[in-house]
Amino acid sequence: MGTPFKRYHIAPVWRGENPQAGRYREFVQCDFDTIGTKSNAADIETLFIIHDLMLKIGFTDFKIRVNNRMILNGLLQLHNLESQSAAVLRALDKLAKSSPEAVIQEMQEQGGLTQQQAEQILALMTAQGTTAEILDSLESQLKGNERGTQGVLNLRELFTAVERAGIPAERVVLDTSIARGLDYYTGTIYET
């Protein structure tokens, strides 16, 4: 099999979690993966596919929120917190449903972070401003960390490609709060 290998499907999938309101064990997922390349072009193509699929199925008022896990991983690396990454990511993944104080507390209790470390990570993950302002701030904070800097560069390339493709800026937004708590997320992350 040659690479990059691309796989697409829509099918029932299952998750190994306890079912709860709005989170079923079985659900239908549209999945497409590119395996065997480290090129940022694959992530940009994924974004274009998401955008085009949303239009094809009739949605016109939607947002694709993006982030890059290399940024958070780089920040954890800078603060010597890589061994606590699972606890930090689980806490950050609750930002939409929990208060910032609760997320900070969980990072401290479950990840062993200091108050200052937890606050710094939360500040980075809830950055506000234009896409360019946020990326500039991230780049400054991650200076000297190759992984985090690469994540910022990948997002800059992605947003440049979005602009060149004529996709309205309000449809693709940088959301640094998207963390995804699973280790198989390694690069660009998308949510609609």
What are these regions, as identified by a protein language model?
Residues 80-108:
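Acidic, His- and aromatic-enriched active-site or binding-groove loops in soluble protein domains
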Residues 1-60, 107-192:
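Positively charged, Gly/Ser-enriched RNA/tRNA-binding surfaces
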Residues 66-78, 178-186:
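Beta-rich nucleic-acid/ligand-interaction surfaces
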Residues 46, 68-71, 88-91, 103, ...:
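Internal, well-ordered alpha-helical segments in soluble enzyme and binding-protein domains
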Residues 75-76, 82, 129:
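Active-site-proximal loop/short-helix segments
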